[in-house]
Amino acid sequence: MKALFIGGTGTISTAISTKLLEDGHELWLINRGNRNTALPPGAHIIQADIGDEEDVSRRLEGQSFDVVVDFIAFTPQHLERDYRLFHGRTKQFLYISSASAYQKPLSDYRINEGTPLANPYWEYSRNKIAGEELLMKLYREEGFPVTIVRPSHTYSERSVPLGLHGTGGSYQVIKRMMEGKKVIIHGDGTSLWTMTHNTDFAKGFIGLMGNIHAIGESVQITSDETLTWNQIYRAIADALGVELRACYVSSAFIAASAPKSWDLRGALLGDKSNSVVFDNTKLKRLVPDYTATVRFDQGVRMAVDYVLNHPECQREDAEFDRWCDRVIEAQEEALAKVRKEG
């Protein structure tokens, strides 16, 4: 199989690239080359900016592919460009959408591909929905061979997955845990969530590549493991060998009090604060041997070990740390005041 990836060095795509090359497939990447250390050895690199359509078209002249995947398309305009570049050049075009596109607030915690798409809280999700609608129109009217993939919370060894963090990433929460500080958990920690290791995601995704039965379909790929946020944070604390000191704060308060640049209204109210259980029946029908095998407690131990042994992954976030302290202090003061007045 000859595949072309736009991107190819992110959390989701790295595991897919690695597995494809291990299995002997021919992989091409359109990549700006900003992270050369992350480029998989053995891949053919087209060093270009996908935003420069004329340059990319010239570099692709005479080429055709079995599969093209865009890992970095976020708007319908990106996909219109992809259609111009790749119609007639590929047998299948896979679009990475998002499970956050599903209806919020949910009418049913059980999620499958038939769940309506609507998210008034998050522009990111609305753009993904608009992208899906455009591609399905191109499939119906122009025969563009589209497959839409909806990941949920997919992680790798390079970052510990969490419910909330600042723009600096998750390390500051890990640091707070190691320092014995309280960490904020949205809600009361009992809502349900699913974490998927990127190597498991890769197995399902590769099973859709070149799969004629996946053309014109939308497919979600997640683990079948369902966890509460309390279980998630306890697993992280256990991996660190520390006690979890949780401070429970309502998602609405978090979203209202956090800087807008963190986009927690979208990330929480439009995604992680909702209880979800994913039904992967459709994926398993299309990819019969798909099974997610990395339990979260196993995957998070690998992530914690990697982060603690790689200083480049330890990005401190003083702004987020101060915000956590203020929120925790305000909640404790409010509770003390209510108790005193009662």
Segments (PLM) and residue ranges:
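N-terminal Rossmann NAD(P)H-binding glycine-rich loop of SDR-like oxidoreductase domains
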Residues: 3-23
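Substrate-positioning beta->alpha
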Residues: 165-173, 186-209, 216-217
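Short-chain dehydrogenase/reductase
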Residues: 109-113, 117-133, 153, 163-171, ...
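Mid/C-terminal beta-alpha module of Rossmann-like enzyme folds, strongest
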Residues: 207-268, 280, 285, 302, ...
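NAD(P)-cofactor binding segment of oxidoreductase domains
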Residues: 63-110, 126-137
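Conserved beta-loop-beta element that borders a ligand/cofactor-binding pocket
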Residues: 133-163
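Rossmann-fold cofactor-recognition segment
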Residues: 41-52, 72-73
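N-terminal Rossmann-fold cofactor-binding loop
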Residues: 30-34, 49-50
